Amino acid sequence: MKKKIFYWSPCLNPVGTVKSTLNSAISAMKFGKDKYDVTLINAFGEWDEHSDFLKKNNIKIINFNYKLYKYLPKKGFFQSRISYLIIYFVCFIPLLRLIKTLKPDYFIAHLITSLPLTIMNLSKFNTKFILRISG
């Protein structure tokens, strides 16, 4: 049975983490295609422009169907923190349900890691949590 890997990388700006996340997910599929089932969580539409590329590389996408990406403030320290808070509260229940129902073996968090950290600490999941820091 394949192990499930979920990627959580909600990014506001096209920073290096986008490329890092894509490369990591593609590598997991390429070198572990018989061992791993790779899924990227599209929390608020931030991965929409990469959907064709992800499908071409056999990476599944789970959409939370919040198309907020265009509307969230991205520039400035305080404005981006407001966006992070919105993402945290809007995605809390969907992410909790997702982990509870689909039970990934590995959960790799790249950005806005406070949300998955909170969920993993509040609940008893068998999921291995990997905090990935890039850049």
Residue ranges and their predicted role:
Residues 106-108, 122-135:
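Active-site proximal beta-strand in glycosyltransferases
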Residues 98-105:
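Glycine-rich phosphate-binding loop signature in dinucleotide/nucleotide-binding domains
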Residues 10, 66, 111-112, 133-135:
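Histidine-centered beta-alpha loop that forms part of the nucleotide-sugar donor binding/catalytic region
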Residues 1-6:
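Extreme N-terminal starter segment of soluble prokaryotic enzymes
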Residues 88-91, 109-115, 133:
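Short His-centered aromatic/hydrophobic patch
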Residues 17, 21, 84, 88-91:
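Conserved donor sugar-nucleotide recognition element shared by glycan-biosynthetic enzymes
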Residues 7-15, 19, 27-82:
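N-terminal strand-loop element at the rim of the active site
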Residues 47-48, 114-118:
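Short, well-ordered alpha-helical microsegments
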